[in-house]
Amino acid sequence: MLLGRMGMTTEAPIFVRIFKEESELEVWKARADGHFYHFKTYPICNWSGELGPKVVQGDKQAPEGFYTVSKGMMNPNSGFHLAFNLGYPNIYDRAHRRTGDFLMVHGKCRSAGCYAMTDALIEEIYGLAREAFAGGQESFQVHAFPFRMSA
């Protein structure tokens, strides 16, 4: 199994990064040393809007920022196959009067403000999160960027 070859376990904590411009979602997993290492990069099937943050409910803009996903935000019965809620708006978004809700990473490859994956890919990503929660992780971070930052 890929995890074992990379020195990672199924139940190890995860961390997620999203890059809009590149249409990529990365999953990072913790190793025994407590540090996170890149596990896999997944192509995002679809996201809506443009580069830049979500501002108002209905703008069909996928959010950018730092979000925390807890076990209760996982939806195995989503109308979009499987989904997890990003937790938008976060404290920063609310302080800037940004509105909206139910912004997700989900399957079905359709987006009106979410990050949509293929069903096969959301199954893998959702499974990694589910196993991390089963292993004791209480929440995981999702950092959504407009593009990769470089010098």
Segments the model singles out, each with a brief description of its role:
Residues 1-15, 27-29, 46-57, 64-71, ...:
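N-terminal post-signal-peptidase region of extra-cytosolic proteins
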Residues 8, 17-21, 76:
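A short catalytic or substrate-binding loop motif that flags glycine-/basic-rich loops and adjacent residues
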Residues 12, 19-23, 63, 80:
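Short, basic and Ser/Thr-rich N-terminal targeting/leader segments
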Residues 14, 22-26, 32-36:
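Primarily extracytoplasmic ectodomains and periplasmic/lumenal surface modules that are beta-strand-rich
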Residues 19-21, 43-49, 142-148:
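Acidic helix-start/capping segments at beta-turn-to-alpha-helix junctions
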Residues 31-47:
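Short Gly/aromatic-enriched secondary-structure transition segments
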Residues 58-151:
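Exported/periplasmic cell-wall-interacting domains
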